[in-house]
Amino acid sequence: MQYKEYGSTNAKTIVFLHGGGLSWWNYREEAEMLKNEYHIIVPILDGHAGSDKPFSTIESNARDIISFIREYLNGSVFMLCGLSLGGQIALEMLSQQGDICQHAIIESAVVISSGITNVLISPAFRLSYPLVKQRWFAKMQFRQLRLKAELFEDYYRDTAAVQKNDMIAFLKAS
């Protein structure tokens, strides 16, 4: 797993976990604002543009981040923040190691998956995957996410770079 890092390693650490189809850049502004007071870590979740391996499971992402925290951050952090897929990974981390953080912020994490959704994702996404690489379609998706306009180029570049099987895997997981 790849990591982006901001601030001093001597400060309290905050870990930000991005949502599916997003990446570290989704937290760039927050990291810049907080880096003078906190040590910020933003993993690039598996299967996303810039990652070093395909997406497998929420559990394996959680294990990898826990291992990183054990090895480099003395086993726990001040705060763990997760959005959507990142929120699910954060919840899994907390279930594997309850003392991984002092505080947690979880946003829009699915805790009970829909069986019918999981069945439909693969065939529907296989048909619509070529659209992901189209700029006009990416703009429509981007508007639905309500992200800041200046993040569009990052979003489009990274979404277009995600492999079909990775996209299906993390859509099914979340």
PLM features: what roles do these ranges have?
Residues S95-Q96, C101-L131:
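Flexible "cap/lid" loop of the alpha/beta hydrolase fold
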